[in-house]
């Protein structure tokens, strides 16, 4: 089996490499990235004998296609978001299946061409989106009528690492974190579509707190299009409530709302400066040095999914909980493991024909639940499920 990891030197890319080397080792792995300066560090904690580092320009679809054309069985795209479309178009051009962890909206237009070519393109297959969607796809089949589907997920520092004004440290792409603070969201509330524009993301009526076992109160912030997934899962006719939320320690919205109102997240370059810089670019460069984890600090991933409905005429509820902590021995972040391991599992499933559908796929429909959960547990990642049925 030959697998290419695009963006292999990034945080999630390293996690995917760890998985491909240590769990059911893959014979031939290509770590492709624009910058390979960290390769020596990788050799310090990972057996790299089956990994070949290759420099590739993610901004060039031609360069990506040339790499994937080298008898590759499947590729994993963990490049920065602006290069996502390049990776998918290159994979389709050369007929190589590809797994990505980004939202799939930009490449859904490729479905017919990919299906006709017999190529599997799997976006949204990381942590969130990813594990949450696989859980949702399984859960909806446990009801005769589904009425509520809420999904919560967030990466945050353990309590002892909360030593800055926003109680947050970087375990993900910081530019991506900033962009997620200006994302439109769509909910189902009382059976009706409710739009939360990005401008209202941190003041919306949908903001609330949840209690997460072992962590306590967490702030839930609007994050994503819940309506799309109710339609994808075929439950939009019965669902009365649906939402997708990010989780943070309380106080997150109180910090970001005034900054957003004052233009600090704007992408418009400022005039009168020595060079054109947008407020977003300024924050992207300014804040990371203040938000770094120390070697002895853990990041945490917390995920909660809630489902309510009817089975055999009785009320039924399902709650699933997932908690991942950083591995201090390897230094691998919980966020990286949740994203990179999931992508690596799905890539193997495609290469081994456990996933045979083609076109633009989705984890909620196309990743086999039991097999996937078995693979997660092999990696020490456990999903706890609580089921309550009225009258039992």
Residue ranges and their predicted role:
Residues 58-70:
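Conserved Rossmann-fold cofactor-binding substructure of NAD(P)-dependent oxidoreductases
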Residues 102-123:
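Rossmann-fold NAD(P)-binding glycine/threonine-rich loop
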Residues 6-9, 14-19:
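N-terminal Rossmann NAD(P)H-binding glycine-rich loop of SDR-like oxidoreductase domains
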Residues 10, 34-38, 105:
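Helix N-cap at the beta1-alpha1 junction of Rossmann-like dinucleotide-binding domains, i.e.
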Residues 142-392:
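C-terminal catalytic/substrate-binding lobe primarily of soluble NAD(P)-dependent oxidoreductases
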Residues 73-78, 98-100:
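N-terminal Rossmann-like NAD(P) cofactor-binding module of classical short-chain dehydrogenase/reductase
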Residues 46-60:
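Rossmann-fold cofactor-recognition segment
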Residues 90-107:
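ADP-ribose/adenylate-binding Rossmann-like module
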């Amino acid at each position: 089996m030959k697998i290419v990891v695009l963006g292999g030197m990034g945080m999630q890319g390293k996690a995917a490499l760890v998985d491909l080397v240590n769990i059911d080792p893959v014979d031939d792995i290509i770590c492709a990235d624009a910058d390979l300066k960290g390769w020596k560090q990788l050799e310090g904690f990972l057996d790299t004998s089956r990994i070949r580092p290759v420099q590739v320009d993610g901004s060039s679809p031609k360069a990506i296609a040339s790499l994937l054309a080298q008898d590759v069985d499947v590729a994993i795209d963990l490049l920065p978001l602006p290069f996502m479309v390049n990776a998918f178009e290159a994979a389709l051009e050369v007929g190589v299946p590809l797994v990505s962890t980004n939202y799939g909206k930009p490449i859904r237009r490729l479905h017919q061409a990919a299906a006709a070519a017999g190529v599997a393109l799997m976006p949204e297959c990381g942590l969130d989106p990813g594990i949450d969607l696989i859980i949702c796809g399984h859960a909806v089949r446990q009801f005769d009528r589904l009425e509520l589907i809420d999904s919560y997920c967030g990466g945050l520092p353990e309590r002892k690492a909360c030593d800055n004004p926003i109680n947050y440290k970087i375990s993900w792409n910081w530019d991506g974190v900033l962009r997620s603070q200006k994302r439109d969201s769509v909910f189902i509330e009382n059976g009706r579509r409710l739009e939360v524009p990005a401008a209202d993301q941190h003041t919306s009526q949908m903001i609330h707190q949840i209690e997460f076992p072992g962590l306590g109160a967490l702030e839930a912030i609007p994050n994503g299009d819940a309506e799309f997934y109710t339609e994808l899962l075929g439950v939009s006719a019965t669902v009365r409530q649906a939402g997708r939320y990010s989780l943070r320690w309380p106080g997150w919205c109180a910090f970001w709302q005034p900054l957003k109102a004052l233009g600090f997240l704007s992408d418009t370059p400022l005039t009168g400066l020595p060079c054109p810089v947008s407020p977003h670019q300024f924050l992207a460069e300014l804040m990371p040095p203040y938000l770094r984890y120390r070697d002895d600090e853990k990041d945490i991933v917390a995920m909660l999914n809630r489902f309510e409905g009817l089975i055999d005429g009785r009320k039924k509820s399902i709650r699933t909980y997932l908690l991942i902590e950083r591995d201090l021995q390897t230094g691998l972040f919980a966020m990286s493991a949740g994203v990179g391991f999931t992508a690596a599992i799905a890539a193997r499933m495609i290469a081994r024909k456990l996933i045979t559908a083609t076109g633009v796929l989705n984890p909620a429909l196309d990743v086999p639940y039991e097999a996937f959960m078995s693979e997660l547990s092999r990696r020490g990642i456990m999903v706890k499920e609580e089921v309550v049925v009225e009258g039992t």
